[in-house]
Regions:
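Ligand-binding pockets and gating/stacking loops
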Residues: 1-359
Length: 359
């Protein structure tokens, strides 16, 4: 109910259908329908390519999240970010090529499998940055240890690691661990500045909603994502609602109203900022989840999982904005026009990055 108006049956005799509680308006040159759950998105309507007919095979969170990230409902395959990093490399040798940000200490469904490298070398998996003032724990040099002392310790550690690795060339996890130590050393010079938001102007902080208690957590994520992209990180993945907070089997009106308010301003701020800085043309932004919610009620005021017809959107990265693709049936339950399976979505994303999904 964010980008597609459901059918109403007001006035019909004995109709079980109720009208949506959302209010709808068309915005932008393309006349994109946006509900009052995301009022600030009206400002970026012409940047959005809304996919209304997404379909997945995952009926529960574990399978759905796994497929949306890896293309398979079963674990063991590389994540989309790992493929992007494998195919395109990184533009900054002092920062990870693939970074994951989350909004709370709560666990993400499937955990590291969402950003893992599967059967590829472990070095391509994402690096998780924790929420709060210290996204990367223990990155800075310990107090009382000089730079020269620190370098000598790391040199010895690298020598021991390389000796241990001889004869174990097939152990990609060991190689990834060695590379992670080397990357951590390089990150000590650049990462603290990359994740330090204090240098941002007040106007930029307001743009992302950092001045508002409701939006400041996700606003920090979005602003940090822009700073990482600006510094050459290839793939940045943001999680909002860690701990399945969007899973509104009950209390959907209250829950989704609160969650939409948390993300609306920060997302708009991110797209606006990327465009102002000339980064949006080369940065693909993808927004969505593992599935949608059914039009039928559950437990009176909730909705169940719906993998048969849901909405996502793309922006930037060469995407033509101000348009919608596909449609569900009148109830919003099944995709009926231009169905886009998760595999189609992944193929499109990889193509926009210049990668052939068949290779």
């Amino acid at each position: 109910e964010s980008f597609e108006r459901p059918v109403t049956a007001m006035g019909e005799v004995n109709s079980p259908l109720l009208p949506s509680k959302r209010k709808w308006k068309q915005h932008g040159q393309g006349g994109l329908w946006i509900s009052d759950w995301l009022p600030n998105h009206a400002r970026i309507a012409d940047e959005l390519c809304v996919l209304r007919s997404c379909v997945s095979d995952g009926i529960n969170h574990a399978g759905g999240v796994c497929q949306m990230n890896t293309g398979s409902v079963f674990g063991g395959r590389p994540s989309l970010g790992a493929w992007a990093t494998y195919g395109l490399g990184t533009e900054n040798q002092s920062l990870p090529g693939f970074v994951v940000l989350k909004d709370s200490k709560s666990a993400i469904v499937n955990g590291v499998r969402c950003w893992g490298s599967g059967f590829m070398p472990a070095g391509y998996q994402g690096v998780l940055l924790e929420p709060g003032d210290e996204p990367i724990a223990n990155l800075n040099r310990p107090r009382g240890v000089s730079r020269a002392q620190h370098e000598r310790k790391l040199t010895l550690l690298n020598k021991l690691n390389r000796q241990h690795a001889r004869g174990r060339e097939s152990n990609t996890e060991l190689e990834a661990r060695i590379r992670s130590y080397e990357l951590a050393y390089r990150m000590q010079a650049e990462a603290p500045e990359a994740v330090d938001l204090s240098a941002e102007t007040e106007s930029t902080r307001r743009l992302y909603g950092l001045d508002n208690e409701t939006t400041q957590v996700y606003g920090r994520q979005c602003l940090m994502a822009r700073r990482l992209v600006e510094r050459g990180v290839r793939f940045v993945q943001l999680y909002h609602g860690a701990g399945s907070k969007w899973d509104s089997h009950s209390g959907m009106e209250k829950n989704h109203s609160r969650l939409c308010a948390q993300v609306d301003i920060p997302i708009v701020g991110l797209l606006t900022d990327l465009k102002q800085r000339g980064l949006l043309e080369d940065t693909l932004v993808i927004w969505g989840g593992e599935f949608g919610r059914t039009p039928m009620s559950e437990k009176g005021d909730g909705r169940d999982h719906n993998p048969t017809g849901f909405t996502m959107y793309l922006a930037g990265g060469g995407v033509k904005g101000g348009q919608t693709i596909g449609a569900t049936d009148d109830l919003g339950l099944y995709a009926v026009q231009d169905k886009l399976h998760v595999h189609d979505i992944h193929a499109t994303i990889l193509a926009l990055m210049g990668l052939d999904h068949t290779q």
